[in-house]
Swiss-Prot record:
HAMAP family for this protein: Ycf3
Gene Ontology terms describing biological process: photosynthesis
TPR repeats: 35-68, 72-105, 120-153
Organism of origin: Prochlorococcus marinus (strain MIT 9312)
Intracellular or extracellular location(s): Cellular thylakoid membrane
Keyword field contains Zinc: no
Function: Essential for the assembly of the photosystem I (PSI) complex. May act as a chaperone-like factor to guide the assembly of the PSI subunits.
Membrane topology: Peripheral membrane protein
One GO cellular component term: plasma membrane-derived thylakoid membrane
Protein name: Photosystem I assembly protein Ycf3
Major localisation: membrane
UniProt similarity note: Belongs to the Ycf3 family.
PROSITE patterns (UniProt xref): TPR (PS50005), TPR_REGION (PS50293)
InterPro entries named in the record: PSI_Ycf3_assembly, TPR-like_helical_dom_sf, TPR_rpt, Ycf3/AcsC/BcsC/TPR_MFPF
Length: 173
């Protein structure tokens, strides 16, 4: 095993031990602790590529979690899995639920835009320029929101918006 991987595994294990210790001593409700444990286990399964297991843990976490920011993060991770599995409509739907819980998640908007932009490129390859423009306009709409939430964080998207003529001057104000 390469030394970088050993170091990363050590860091992951150390973080897990520290996080578990903090969760045990924190003055929070048992329900919240369980929600966090399900979330943590979902994240571990997702990082290991076991997406079905991760989704099950995330669903359990959502049943217990009341904090909107944490719910938004859990939903975002579920949407990432759906996106990875090619379930684009379900991914968009789940990103939108994440944004309802926590509207300040620019990465959700960025990823929705990636799906729209991909659909636009596919339409272009099929010679359907009207459909391409519809999808590109939708991508521009959500990407503009993402850039406003995270200025300078998505330079490639900012460049796409400028180069495609879909950038508005007020986006940077």
């Amino acid at each position: 095993m390469p030394s970088n991987q050993n170091r990363d595994n050590f860091i992951d294990k150390a973080f897990t031990v520290i996080a578990e210790s903090i969760v045990k001593i924190m003055p929070i409700e048992e329900k919240e602790k369980k929600a966090y444990i399900y979330y943590r286990d979902g994240l571990a399964a997702q990082n290991n590529g076991d997406y079905s297991e991760a989704l099950e843990y995330y669903k359990e976490s959502l049943l217990l979690e009341e904090n909107k920011i944490d719910r938004g993060e859990t939903l975002k991770n579920m949407a990432i899995i759906f996106m990875s599995n090619g379930e684009e409509d379900l991914s968009i739907e789940t990103y939108e639920k994440a944004l309802v819980e926590n509207p300040k998640q620019p990465s959700c908007l960025k990823n929705i835009g990636l799906i729209y932009e991909k659909r636009g490129r596919n339409a272009e390859q099929n010679g359907d320029l009207d459909q391409r423009d519809i999808w590109f306009d939708k991508a521009a709409e959500v990407w503009t929101k993402a850039v406003k939430l995270y200025p300078g964080g998505y330079l490639d998207i900012e460049n796409w918006l400028k180069n495609s003529g879909r950038s508005s001057i007020d986006m940077y104000l």
